[in-house]
Amino acid sequence: MTISVIVPCFNEEESIPLFHEAMEAVKYKIRDQFEYIFVNDGSTDQTLPVLRELSSRCPDVHYLSFSRNFGKEAALYAGLQEASGDFVTVMDVDLQDPPELLVEMKAMLDSNPELDCVGTRRTTREGEPPIRSFFANLFYKLINKISQVEMVDGARDFRLMRRQMVEAILEVSEYNRFSKGI
């Protein structure tokens, strides 16, 4: 089995080596093959040269590079299109998403074949500036009022999906997506 790790990057030259090192320390606990798909979203720093160098040293590291910044959703979609793994995870390169959780997420999917996805959610806004917390809460209240699909407050992009879920997402025809709502 292979796990594709999709990592959107925008001006993350310093975070990339730290992320890769942290993931390498965790992947041996899972025992599946890994492929990393970094998506450079039009960075203006040294993100692209860092990705080139890492890819030249590590055969399981691949990257895509956008000519300009198209946004995280476009980067995620491009990564999903490129991923070939039996399982696919989406992670932030700045280690907001603890790589150790991937071990638990994979174990949960392995022991529950009826599940297509295991996701994460933020349970507290502690440490967040009050104004950001206010607008985040307001966003979820508004979106749940106008949408037919309920969004869980604190939903994160960090999730582990089976291939069949990825294929279903790729079939969604909407151009402007919000992956936390999928």
Task: Give the residues covered by each predicted segment.
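Cell-envelope/extracellular polymer assembly enzymes that use nucleotide-activated donors
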Residues: 2-4, 35
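Structural signature of the Rossmann-like NAD(P)-dependent dehydrogenase/reductase core
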Residues: 4, 40-43, 65
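Alpha-helical transmission elements in cytosolic ATPase-linked domains
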Residues: 18, 22, 46, 50-53, ...
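A conserved acidic beta->alpha catalytic loop
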Residues: 40-49, 95-96
